[in-house]
Amino acid sequence: MFRIELTRGSSWQEPVETIDHRDCETNSIDAAVAEAKYWLVQTQKNAPARGVTHYRVVSENGTAIGGPP
């Protein structure tokens, strides 16, 4: 299972704020990243006032990957 976070800031590694988050119940990092990218684009399109700039996918052990760069 992974946690997907939508963040605001200059980079996904050091977000200024976590805007929203949700759990992604999959064992596939590729599936979690695909869901995160889709959620990011949809949020930017449908709720631009939220100021979302990046996504992060965090594993149960705390390892994070994200984007866009």
Sequence positions of predicted segments:
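Short aromatic-glycine-(Arg/Gly/Cys) micro-motifs in beta-strand/loop hairpins
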Residues: 1-21
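A short, charged, amphipathic alpha-helix used as a generic interaction element across diverse proteins
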Residues: 16-17, 26-49
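A short, sequence-level motif marking secondary-structure junctions
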Residues: 24-26, 69
